């Protein structure tokens, strides 16, 4: 799997305006703040009483909205969910996907020491407002079927 740092992801997006930042965090995580130009298709949904559960529509919504030959950088909170999403997308035939190491928040070791700074830690461009076409609800509707997204 190809991996890039948040800075490398930002540089790719700057050089290639067609490069897509796919944020696979839950809807509330995305709405709290995300990379500029990111779109949100959660790998997992968050439910207050149940925690995280798989998004059964992840593959369907990805395939309906992202051409397989697109250049896509995939991020999450720290890099774990996005690595899984990259694996899934590669199996589906996506040819140019890269996992964003450290994700949006950054990755720390067991002692709390930062081992990979995230997008927000590096002060890369971010926002909490969403364009309608970047939100999961809109992306899921384009497929003609929408499941509840918490």
Where are these regions (language model features)?
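Short, surface-exposed ligand- or partner-binding patches at beta-edge/loop junctions that are enriched
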Residues: 74-75
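Rhodanese-like catalytic fold shared by cysteine-dependent sulfurtransferases
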Residues: 1-19, 27-71, 80-150
């Amino acid at each position: 799997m190809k991996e890039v740092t948040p800075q490398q992801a930002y540089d790719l997006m700057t050089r290639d305006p067609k490069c897509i930042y796919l944020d696979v965090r839950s809807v509330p995580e995305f709405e709290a703040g995300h990379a500029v130009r990111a779109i949100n298709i959660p790998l997992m949904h968050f439910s207050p009483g149940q925690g995280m559960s798989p998004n059964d529509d992840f593959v369907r919504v990805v395939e309906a909205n992202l051409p397989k030959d697109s250049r896509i950088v995939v991020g999450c909170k720290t890099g774990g969910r996005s690595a899984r999403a990259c694996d899934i997308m590669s199996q589906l035939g996506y040819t140019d996907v890269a996992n964003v190491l450290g994700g949006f928040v950054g990755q720390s070791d067991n002692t709390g020491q930062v081992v990979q700074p995230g997008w927000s830690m590096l002060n890369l461009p971010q926002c909490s407002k969403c364009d309608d076409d970047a939100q999961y609800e809109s992306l899921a509707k384009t497929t003609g079927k929408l499941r509840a997204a918490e």
